[in-house]
Amino acid sequence: MTADANNLIWIDLEMTGLEPEVDVVIEIATLVTDSELNILAQGPVIAIHQSDETLAKMDDWNQKHHGQSGLIDRVKASQFTEADAIEQTIKFLAQYVPKGASPMCGNSIGQDRRFLNKYMLELEEYFHYRNVDVSTIKELVKRWSPETMKGFTKQGTHQALQDIQESIAELQFYRKEVFKI
């Protein structure tokens, strides 16, 4: 497949917490869709190795959710570094989207961009500076048309790939039910 500037890159990170100054990335996943939100390809889903000491610093919420999902065990067993994750992800993305063409797409994507700026700058620079943030639409629909919100429910697994898939499905829902296009 040739790279297409109209394709969209969807990304999700799982982190040890919400503060990039003290927390780190522990999982990354990407998907590429066409402009109509049809999934074209799944990128590598990578658990990034972190030390036991780093993982022990996670708060209770993160310990619980990342423990239940099996992510903590995958991170401990992983041999992948942040550099490996950057390299593999960019290699995948370059097949589908030229550098600088796609906005960063996902839910609460500003948070992911903060961590990419801190830990994975080369990957962050692959994206256009704009964002397609599904959570922005969700917040507006919640306020302007709350009854519409009943039509879509997320599982909230806090696993990067599943979260991206849900973000795409959520935007497809808003496109049909809110934008009617």
UniProtKB/Swiss-Prot annotation:
Catalytic machinery residues: 129
Keywords: Cytoplasm, Exonuclease, Hydrolase, Nuclease
One Pfam family recorded for the sequence: RNase_T
Superkingdom classification of source: Bacteria
SUPFAM superfamilies: Ribonuclease H-like
EC number per UniProt: 3.1.15.-
Entries under InterPro entries matching the protein: Exonuclease_RNaseT/DNA_pol3, Oligoribonuclease, RNaseH-like_sf, RNaseH_sf
Segment forming the signal sequence: none
Family: Belongs to the oligoribonuclease family.
Biological role: 3'-to-5' exoribonuclease specific for small oligoribonucleotides.
PANTHER family assigned: OLIGORIBONUCLEASE, MITOCHONDRIAL
Name assigned to this protein: Oligoribonuclease
Species this chain originates from: Shewanella denitrificans (strain OS217 / ATCC BAA-1090 / DSM 15013)
Gene name for this UniProt entry: orn
